[in-house]
Amino acid sequence: MASDLRISFQGEPSRNDPGSENLEHKPSQGPAVQEEEETYEFLRTQLSLLQNSNNSCARQELQNLYKLFHSWLQPEKHSKDEIISCLVLEQFMINGHCSDRSMLKEKWNASGRNLEKFMEDLTDESMKPPGLVHVHMQGQEALFSENMPLKEVIVHLTKQLSVGSPTGTDMETPSWTPQDTSLETGQGEWGDKENGDNIYHINDSITSQGNEIPSLLIIREEDYPRPEEDSVSLKNPLSSRKAGLGMSGSQEGSLKGPSYQDVLMEGGPGFLSQSIQVSPEPVPTHQRTEGNSTRGGHQERCREAQNSYRCEKCPKIFRYFSQLKAHQRRHNNERTFTCAECNRGFFQASDLHVHQKIHAEEKPFTCSTCEKSFSHKTNLLAHERIHTGEKPYECSLCHRSYRQSSTYHRHLRNHQKSAFRGVSSTPEAS
């Protein structure tokens, strides 16, 4: 997005252009947050202008983009540094580097929208590595970035399929900017933050050679085990501009809202109900490929990830047995990690460590309204919302708002469970 913003609109509007007068813009009123939300809504509604007549469509689109960015950035109110800082933060979130957009925006507002102060409080905990997706199509397979458009994935696998024929040529590794990636299976360097592999079929509307609709088996991959986390989230609607593995048109990508732990890829419950394929445990996820020797080493690298483990009580899938056992403790309510001071039990050691900070005497963060102290700044921010009435966590499916992220995540899990119940009642896709 940053490169697109280099287009300059500082030139004088043409007198012969009947639409050039629309480039004048008055400063918008109201809170900055409300303006930003209205701006993105305005952008979505203006996409229909692309269907207008050929002689005015491009000009009208540029005028609308100018109004959009002028309303958002407000150059008459903010300095160049403030505008650049705002664009840097937005690009940072669009690239999928943040694990929790809401928390990042809270820190941004708390810093007074000052980039230097914001970076001082920013930690690597807010970062997440880009996810990789293991894709099977008609005997071909590869690892792709979750941000790579589905059309590009199909094009690459179609080329790889033609390589398997006697007349084929050497297989090419696709490149895609800005995320730049398709990695062969087993060569991923980043890994995925998911606790396990999510398996589902997609029959996309994009047709391949011969007007056949390719069938894809997409598996969420990971390169290293991580303890199961309790948070779930769906995509923030503001990140819909980001390209990714999703439906054609918008090409929605990785789950953006806040972090996408234990939630299947884009589309919401409607998409889940038509894409998930349930199978008994354990689930073999690796499909054996046939062809020339160029795929022999490829199979060897996938051999260690040949089996996955499915929970018997819910449709979640885990690559490692240890992750499955940790997950099953939640179903059985086995809180094996106990606090020595208050005897409260927890499912994971990491949860216990976070809890033990509550018993620490040091509580440097104090509420300016009621003078209640907290050991963590995030707890203070959540507490202050009680006084302000702010509810920043809004569900994109039912538009209910919540004050705390934990309540919001619990609500999202209810949506997820409803989607899985709908899947279990439908016949298995062929």
Swiss-Prot record:
Segments forming C2H2-type zinc fingers: 309-331, 337-359, 365-387, 393-415
Signal peptide, first to last residue: none
GO biological process, one term: telomere maintenance via telomere lengthening
Keyword presence, Nucleus: yes
InterPro entries named among the record's database cross-references: SCAN_dom, SCAN_sf, Znf_C2H2_sf, Znf_C2H2_type
Pfam short name (any one): zf-C2H2
Keyword Zinc-finger: yes
Region (Disordered): 1-38, 164-196, 224-257, 281-300
Residues in SCAN box domain copies: 44-126
Superkingdom field: Eukaryota
GO CC, any one term: chromosome, telomeric region
Localization in the cell: Nucleus; Chromosome, Telomere
Ranges annotated as biased composition (Polar residues): 164-185
PROSITE patterns cross-referenced by the UniProt entry: SCAN_BOX (PS50804), ZINC_FINGER_C2H2_1 (PS00028), ZINC_FINGER_C2H2_2 (PS50157)
Keyword annotations: Chromosome, DNA-binding, Metal-binding, Nucleus, Repeat, Telomere, Transcription, Transcription regulation, Zinc, Zinc-finger
Molecular functions (GO terms): DNA-binding transcription factor activity, RNA polymerase II-specific; RNA polymerase II cis-regulatory region sequence-specific DNA binding; zinc ion binding
Function recorded in the entry: Embryonic stem (ES) cell-specific transcription factor required to regulate ES cell pluripotency. Binds telomeres and plays a key role in genomic stability in ES cells by regulating telomere elongation. Acts as an activator of spontaneous telomere sister chromatid exchange (T-SCE) and telomere elongation in undifferentiated ES cells.
Protein's UniProt name: Zinc finger and SCAN domain-containing protein 4
Organism listed in the record: Ailuropoda melanoleuca (Giant panda)
